[in-house]
Amino acid sequence: MEIVLEAKERTDKKRSTLRRIRSQGGIPAILYGKKVENKMIFVTAAELEKVLREGGRTS
Protein backbone atom coordinates (compact mmCIF):
# COMPACT_ATOMS: atom_id res chain seq x y z
CA MET A 1 0.00 0.00 0.00
CA GLU A 2 1.37 3.39 -0.97
CA ILE A 3 0.71 6.40 1.25
CA VAL A 4 1.32 9.90 -0.06
CA LEU A 5 1.69 12.89 2.23
CA GLU A 6 1.67 16.25 0.50
CA ALA A 7 4.25 18.62 1.97
CA LYS A 8 5.47 22.06 0.98
CA GLU A 9 9.00 23.35 1.35
CA ARG A 10 9.64 26.33 3.60
CA THR A 11 12.70 28.54 3.60
CA ASP A 12 12.10 30.84 6.56
CA LYS A 13 13.25 29.64 10.01
CA LYS A 14 11.84 32.61 11.93
CA ARG A 15 9.70 31.91 14.96
CA SER A 16 7.01 34.26 13.62
CA THR A 17 6.77 32.21 10.43
CA LEU A 18 6.43 28.98 12.40
CA ARG A 19 3.67 30.55 14.52
CA ARG A 20 1.85 31.66 11.36
CA ILE A 21 2.08 28.16 9.86
CA ARG A 22 0.67 26.64 13.06
CA SER A 23 -2.12 29.22 13.32
CA GLN A 24 -3.18 28.35 9.77
CA GLY A 25 -3.44 24.64 10.61
CA GLY A 26 0.03 23.59 9.47
CA ILE A 27 2.71 21.50 11.12
CA PRO A 28 6.32 22.54 10.52
CA ALA A 29 8.82 19.69 10.17
CA ILE A 30 12.34 18.86 9.01
CA LEU A 31 13.27 15.89 6.83
CA TYR A 32 16.62 14.31 7.66
CA GLY A 33 18.45 11.80 5.53
CA LYS A 34 21.79 10.12 5.17
CA LYS A 35 24.04 11.92 2.68
CA VAL A 36 21.17 14.28 1.85
CA GLU A 37 20.75 17.90 2.83
CA ASN A 38 18.04 18.55 5.45
CA LYS A 39 14.76 19.98 4.11
CA MET A 40 12.43 22.27 6.05
CA ILE A 41 8.83 21.48 5.17
CA PHE A 42 5.31 21.86 6.47
CA VAL A 43 2.15 19.79 6.12
CA THR A 44 -1.44 20.56 6.97
CA ALA A 45 -2.75 18.97 10.15
CA ALA A 46 -5.79 17.62 8.29
CA GLU A 47 -3.60 15.93 5.66
CA LEU A 48 -1.37 14.35 8.32
CA GLU A 49 -4.37 13.07 10.30
CA LYS A 50 -5.81 11.55 7.11
CA VAL A 51 -2.55 9.74 6.33
CA LEU A 52 -2.20 8.48 9.90
CA ARG A 53 -5.78 7.16 9.86
CA GLU A 54 -5.26 5.36 6.54
CA GLY A 55 -1.79 4.02 7.34
CA GLY A 56 -2.51 3.19 10.94
CA ARG A 57 -4.75 0.23 10.17
CA THR A 58 -3.65 -3.23 11.19
CA SER A 59 -4.06 -6.28 9.01
Swiss-Prot record:
GO biological process: translation
Signal peptide: none
One GO CC term, this protein: ribonucleoprotein complex
InterPro entries linked to this entry: Rbsml_bL25/Gln-tRNA_synth_N, Ribosomal_bL25/Gln-tRNA_synth, Ribosomal_L25_dom
GO molecular function: structural constituent of ribosome
Keywords noted in UniProt: Ribonucleoprotein, Ribosomal protein
Alphabetized Pfam families for the sequence: Ribosomal_L25p
Protein family (similarity comment): Belongs to the bacterial ribosomal protein bL25 family.
Name of this chain's protein: Large ribosomal subunit protein bL25
Organism: Bacillus caldolyticus
